[in-house]
Curated annotation (Swiss-Prot):
Positions that bind ATP: K247
Family according to the record: Belongs to the class-I aminoacyl-tRNA synthetase family. TyrS type 2 subfamily.
Domain of life assignment: Bacteria
Catalytic reaction(s) noted: tRNA(Tyr) + L-tyrosine + ATP = L-tyrosyl-tRNA(Tyr) + AMP + diphosphate + H(+)
GO cellular component: cytosol
Name this protein carries in UniProt: Tyrosine--tRNA ligase
Organism: Prochlorococcus marinus (strain MIT 9312)
Gene: tyrS
Pfam families: tRNA-synt_1b
Length: 412
């Protein structure tokens, strides 16, 4: 029997993988069962690098699982990577990240904690901040900023270059002769050292974090600690049903979005990702997927997720208002004037695209409007004028809104 099959449902739901199956003395399920029987609080680590200002539904999966551990008697150890964020996790990147300033990182961290519900009652927040015995919030600058050269050399001596090059992103860049900065090799070691300092029993992460979590296990072993278990959750597919949820793909739902915006986006997701959204974003029994038609499932899922983040009353209002808008304006999408992309040379920066389409008098005016939050794509503000669109497919069919008056639909 797979060890996963005997895990409690609150833990097994949505998990892509955990490792190892068996620790030094016990399997993962035995660790969980033993903790319950003996009222032992496991230390469950989740690290977040505040490299941006907004949390979206893709991020929320990990926080929901961390909350499940809290609700079942364990300690959430939330690591704010204020030091590591200034380096930048190379995971998923084909080039060196731009380093952030200390002030940028601190400001971002404040917005993250606010979005997670800090200051709100436990029944209105994503994490339980009320019960001090259920959460520890640590900033890794506490221990990383003061590391001396001897300590850094000891960390670096616990891993090998060949081990680092086994990481997919490093391997690709090395083989393609794309530069890898030495400080990027240090990132997984610093994340792993966080686990040593907080003595985590379990670390949560997306499937793309397996390498970094495994490094944490190695470092705990190096420092004579019992290695943590890794629990990996899927990377959520975005609203387009194809690419991972990411602001750069304009396929996200942000936690700060109002209830109408959240509901209206979710009720239009493609059929192929509805089951995944039900499993990862709601608490409903998955048997609801068996009989209902896709349209009913879209509405049910959108209502449940909006309820989770805005409450039942706001979610119900959003559903009602969305239906009124649909009934009153269902023909109007086809009436939105098109704007052709046929003469645009891709790849192209966003500000240059808009000025090339004669939507602004100059590139500088285009930049100012974008930075000021006056431009949206599919109801989502785009505030980075330098974002690059690789091809027409990135924009075809999407709705561009500039201020309150200009609305266009991108077409080839």
């Amino acid at each position: 029997m797979s060890d996963k099959l005997i895990l409690p449902s609150w833990l097994s739901r949505g998990i892509e993988e955990y490792f190892p199956i068996k620790g030094i003395d016990q399997t993962f399920s035995e660790i969980i069962d033993d903790a319950k029987k003996n009222n032992k609080k496991l230390r469950v680590k989740l690290g977040i690098d505040p490299t941006g200002t907004d949390i979206h539904l893709g991020h929320s999966i990990l926080f929901k699982k961390l909350r499940a551990f809290q609700d079942n008697g364990h300690i959430a150890v939330l690591i704010i990577g204020d030091f590591t964020a200034q380096i930048g996790d190379p995971t998923g990147k084909n080039k060196t990240r731009v380093q952030l300033s200390e002030k940028q990182v601190k400001d971002n961290a404040k917005t993250y904690l606010t979005q997670l519900g800090m200051g709100k009652p436990a029944n209105e927040s994503i994490l339980d901040f009320d019960s001090k015995d259920k959460i520890e919030i640590r900033y890794n600058s506490e221990w990383l900023k003061g590391l001396n050269l001897n300590s850094i050399i000891e960390l670096m001596g616990s891993a090998t270059v060949s081990q680092m090059l086994a990481k997919e992103e490093f391997n690709k860049r090395y083989n393609s002769q794309v530069p890898i900065a030495l400080h990027e090799f240090l990132y997984p070691l610093l994340q792993g050292y966080d686990s040593v300092v907080v003595q985590s029993d379990i670390e949560l992460g997306g499937t793309d974090q397996k390498f970094n979590i495994a490094i944490g296990r190695d470092l705990q072993r190096h420092f004579k600690q019992e290695p943590q278990f890794g629990v990996l959750l899927p990377i959520l597919t975005g609203l387009d049903g194809i690419k991972k949820m990411s602001k750069s793909e304009f396929n996200t739902v942000g936690l700060t979005e109002d209830s109408l915006s959240m509901y209206s986006k979710l009720e239009k997701v493609p059929d192929n990702i509805i089951p995944t959204y039900f499993e990862l974003l709601t608490e409903l029994d998955l048997s609801v997927l068996n009989d209902a038609n896709p349209r009913e499932l879209q509405r049910r899922m959108a209502l449940e997720v909006t309820t989770l983040f805005h409450g039942a009353e706001e979610a119900s209002k959003a559903q009602s208002n969305c239906e009124k808008l649909f009934l009153g304006h269902k023909e109007k999408v086809g009436e939105i004037p098109e704007i052709s992309l046929k003469d645009i040379v891709f790849p192209v920066k966003f500000f240059y695209l808009l000025s090339s389409l004669k939507l602004f008098k100059s590139s500088s005016e285009s930049k100012r409007s974008i930075k000021g939050g006056g431009v949206k794509i599919d109801s989502q503000k785009v505030i980075n004028p330098d974002i690059v669109f690789d091809s027409k497919k990135d924009l075809e069919g999407k709705i561009l809104q500039i201020g309150k008056k200009i609305i266009k639909r991108f077409e080839n």
